[in-house]
């Protein structure tokens, strides 16, 4: 090998290798000091792109977890508020149950209603004030609210919370048929009871025998209430049109085939003859007699069989119908119609031509005065809702007009044939009660009769003995039937809140499962990113040692190579 001075190839090679070693040593020191394998795109462009994507996904999943926890917090806030509302509803139902017995007076029931009103106010207060970050939760506006729970857009869970105000919950369906005055066999079917199928009940005979009538039908309906969601009550009751007046029954007077015979009774049945005689055979007839607060005779079927009077109970008893099979009331714990069909429905007052009183009543509506329509649908009235029935004593219209004190008798200026149509006055629908039978005909006021409110003939209003019609009822639990209705409505409200809470619980569980899943996903994504981005300290330490030694040996080699060139001087000595 020749000696050259101008170009030191060995030194140049040593220098080049030293530069590479120094660069690699710098990279190794950078990795060891940062803990990252990739500190710049030059380190691993493809790996950096993948790692950045994974880092973004992990960060997004972390926020999604926070979103899910926020959603759970919202739902838990609503759930706890509704738990308090349920306690209020339990108390309302308990107080309604307390009022649903005739040991309570109007005064004590009014006190109970006042308590219920206060409880409803607090229930509404909870519904209107429960909020999260300024958003109302229980007022009905929190519907289809979305929570992002994924790393990509539109990966959401929706949550809705139903309204819980007293005007929105407890909506209960009440339907009561017309008064039934005929017997028969009923085959009742509930249409689409579950939204798809029909439910057919076993046929029931409506008659006056034991084990028949609306009581037997109600028992059949209630036996299947868990499946259909419909419960039934019955009211088989004949109420006198006026306070008991002196009279007598016929010798063949009988109730439900059991002969009671002739009884003489005085005004108000003060001697107790009529009521005692009827109650003496109540275990056989199934019919019990009593007087209401107005002194009217009340015949009540204890087991729901019909009430059939044969012979004559006497006009003084005021019983309008000698055959009565009562009214059937249906209750459903939601506001949807009860769609019925079947055979023999006229025997339960629910035939095609019968008037069925229907109403959906919310919890708030039970707080104030119960309207006539709602009261009739709830089964308050023993008779069908509608126009008033005027009850007077006479053998006929002409006979009535001829009676002294009628206002149409001699010298009054009015007569049957006066051309004024006074033979048709008897306001809306007047029942003429003769001394021989219970009811004659119904008459309607003729136009131009001159007999109306404000007509100047108002003195004739004194001839009205009684009015039987649907009318408004006092608030809530202030009546026995009202208390029963409030129990039904409170039960519906409890069911409504339980359903809302169940929906909330389902969403909470869904969110929790999602959070658990994306937490695991986030861990795995971070692990994948770490595998790509983070440095392996064991391998990198070995790598650092390698380049550190090479750097030192390179410096030594370069020094030695420069020293070799000094040998040229020896040739010149």
Curated annotation (Swiss-Prot):
Q: Kindly give the InterPro entries that the UniProt entry links to this protein.
A: Flagellin, Flagellin_C, Flagellin_C_sub2, Flagellin_hook_IN_motif, Flagellin_N
The cellular component terms of Gene Ontology attached to this UniProt record, alphabetical and capped at eight, are:
bacterial-type flagellum; extracellular region
Q: Where is the signal peptide?
A: none
**Homology family:** Belongs to the bacterial flagellin family.
A single GO molecular function term of this UniProt record: structural molecule activity
Q: Would you tell me the protein name for this molecule? A: Flagellin B
Q: Which gene encodes it?
A: flaB
Does Secreted show up as a keyword for this record? yes
The entry's localization annotation reads: Secreted; Bacterial flagellum
Briefly, what is this protein's role?
Flagellin is the subunit protein which polymerizes to form the filaments of bacterial flagella.
């Amino acid at each position: 090998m020749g000696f050259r001075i101008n170009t030191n190839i060995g030194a140049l090679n040593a220098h080049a290798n030293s530069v590479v070693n120094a660069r690699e040593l710098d990279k190794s020191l950078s990795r060891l000091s940062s803990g990252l394998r990739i500190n710049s795109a030059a380190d691993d462009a493809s790996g950096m792109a993948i790692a950045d994507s994974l880092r973004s996904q992990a960060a997004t999943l972390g926020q999604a977890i926070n979103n899910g926890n926020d959603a759970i917090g919202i739902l838990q806030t609503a759930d706890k508020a509704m738990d308090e509302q349920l306690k209020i509803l339990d108390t309302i139902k308990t107080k309604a149950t307390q009022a649903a017995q005739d040991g309570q007076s109007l005064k004590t029931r009014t006190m109970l209603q006042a308590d219920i009103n206060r409880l409803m106010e607090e229930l509404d207060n909870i519904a209107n004030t429960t909020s999260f970050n300024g958003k109302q939760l229980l007022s009905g506006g929190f519907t289809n609210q979305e929570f992002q729970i994924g790393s990509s857009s539109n990966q959401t869970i929706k949550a809705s919370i139903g309204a819980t105000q007293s005007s929105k919950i407890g909506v209960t369906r009440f339907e009561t048929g017309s008064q039934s005055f005929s017997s028969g066999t009923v085959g009742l079917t509930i249409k689409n009871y579950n939204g798809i199928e029909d439910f057919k009940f076993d046929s029931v005979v409506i008659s006056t025998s034991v084990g028949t009538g609306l009581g037997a039908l109600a028992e059949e309906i209630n036996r299947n209430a868990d499946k259909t969601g419909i419960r039934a009550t019955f009211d088989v009751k004949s109420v006198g049109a006026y306070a008991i007046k002196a009279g007598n029954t016929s010798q063949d007077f009988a109730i439900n085939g059991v002969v009671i015979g002739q009884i003489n009774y005085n005004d108000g049945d003060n001697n107790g003859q009529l009521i005692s005689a009827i109650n003496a055979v109540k275990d056989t007839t199934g019919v019990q007699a009593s007087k209401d607060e107005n002194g009217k005779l009340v015949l009540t079927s204890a087991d729901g069989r019909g009430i059939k009077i044969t012979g004559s109970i006497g006009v003084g008893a005021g019983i309008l119908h000698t055959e009565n099979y009562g009214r059937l009331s249906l209750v459903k714990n939601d506001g949807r119609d009860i769609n019925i069909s079947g055979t023999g429905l006229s025997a339960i007052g629910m035939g095609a031509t019968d008037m069925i009183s229907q109403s959906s009543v919310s919890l708030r509506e039970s707080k104030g005065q119960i309207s006539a329509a709602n009261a009739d649908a709830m089964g308050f009235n023993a008779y069908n809702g509608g126009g008033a029935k005027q009850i007077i004593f006479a053998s006929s219209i002409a006979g009535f007009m001829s009676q002294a004190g009628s206002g149409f008798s001699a010298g009054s200026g009015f007569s049957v044939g006066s051309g004024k149509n006074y033979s048709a006055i008897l306001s809306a629908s007047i029942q003429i009660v003769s001394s021989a039978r219970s009811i004659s005909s119904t008459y309607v006021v003729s136009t131009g009769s001159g007999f109306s409110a404000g007509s100047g003939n108002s003195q004739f209003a004194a001839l009205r003995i009684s009015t039987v019609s649907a009318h408004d009822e006092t608030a809530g639990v202030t009546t026995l039937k009202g208390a029963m209705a409030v129990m039904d409505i409170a039960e519906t409200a409890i069911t409504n809140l339980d359903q809302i809470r169940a929906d909330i619980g389902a969403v909470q569980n869904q969110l929790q499962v999602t959070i658990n899943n994306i937490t695991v996903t986030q861990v795995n994504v971070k692990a994948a990113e770490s595998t790509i981005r983070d440095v392996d300290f064991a391998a990198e330490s070995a790598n650092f040692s390698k380049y550190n030694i090479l750097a030192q040996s390179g410096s030594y080699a370069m020094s030695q190579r420069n020293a070799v060139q000094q040998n040229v001087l020896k040739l010149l000595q």
